[in-house]
């Protein structure tokens, strides 16, 4: 992964990205080319959003994930729903909008979030957070009979998972068992600290002497098993 110490002020050279206009174009790339594409998108995103303004962190954190989702799934036939709209900048770049990325937040320019009016690849008009699983579930139920082979994917972050709407949708999804995939982007990041009874309850558990003792004992027990010990 290429490391950037500052926002590029000149348009980067992106030979692979220049040839990508739709997700179908990336499905013929080799693994090495996909890795190079990720680096090119990263630099291009820094440059373009650096010109227009916007939220970089969410998009920068899902570049490889965005590439692989569009590589594996047949978008836009398969529905891809992004939970926090700022994560969708790489998605916009790969779905025919890279030449307009500098217009984000400008009059007549691209929306800062996915918009169904903007592209057929935007399956849902995303707001800020916690709506993706509900939206994906509704799509899956609606197409269960007419398009049973259609797949539905939601990408949600650990911060968005603290909302009640996400928990309710998870519960309903587990009951109905539709043809869906939920990806948890657990990056330990959120705009503000978690609040609420559930968060406080688990915080007390994780900070308790009992929990710490159990964790320490479990880690010692698993030490002969390197892979399990790492998880502990």
Write out the residue ranges for each language-model feature.
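N-terminal amphipathic, basic-rich helices that act as targeting or association modules
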Residues: 1-95
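Long, well-ordered, tryptophan-enriched scaffold segments
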Residues: 2-11, 188-232
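Gly-rich Lys/Arg/Thr-decorated short loops/hinges at beta-loop-alpha junctions or inter-strand turns
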Residues: 15-22, 43-48, 111-123, 221-232
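Hydrophobic alpha-helical scaffolding
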Residues: 27, 55-58, 128, 159-163, ...
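Generic secondary-structure signature for well-ordered alpha-helical cores
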Residues: 39-50, 74, 106-109, 141-144, ...
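Cofactor-binding active-site loop characterized by glycine-rich and histidine/acidic residues
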Residues: 55-176
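Generic beta-strand/beta-sheet core signal
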Residues: 83, 153-156, 181-185, 192
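A short alpha/beta connector and helix-capping loop motif
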Residues: 163-187, 195, 201-207
């Amino acid at each position: 992964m290429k490391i950037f110490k500052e926002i590029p002020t000149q348009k980067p050279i992106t030979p692979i990205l220049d040839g990508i206009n739709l997700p179908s174009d990336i499905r013929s790339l080799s693994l090495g080319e996909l890795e190079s594409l990720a680096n090119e998108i990263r630099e291009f995103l820094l440059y373009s959003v650096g010109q227009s303004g916007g939220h970089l962190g969410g998009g920068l954190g899902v570049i490889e994930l965005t590439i692989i989702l569009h590589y594996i799934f047949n978008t836009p036939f398969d529905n891809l729903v992004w939970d926090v709209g700022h994560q969708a900048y790489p998605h916009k770049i790969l779905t025919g909008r890279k030449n307009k990325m500098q217009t984000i937040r400008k009059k007549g320019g691209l929306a800062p979030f996915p918009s169904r009016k903007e592209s057929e690849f935007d399956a849902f008009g995303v707001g800020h957070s916690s709506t993706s699983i509900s939206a994906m579930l509704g799509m899956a139920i609606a197409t269960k009979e007419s398009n049973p082979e259609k797949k539905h994917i939601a990408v949600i972050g650990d911060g968005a998972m603290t909302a009640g709407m996400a928990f309710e949708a998870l519960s309903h999804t587990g009951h109905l068992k539709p043809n869906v995939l939920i990806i948890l982007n657990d990056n330990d990041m959120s705009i503000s600290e978690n609040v609420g009874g559930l968060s406080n309850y688990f915080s007390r558990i994780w900070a308790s002497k009992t929990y710490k003792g159990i964790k320490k004992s479990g880690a010692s027990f698993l030490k002969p098993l390197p892979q399990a010990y790492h998880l502990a």
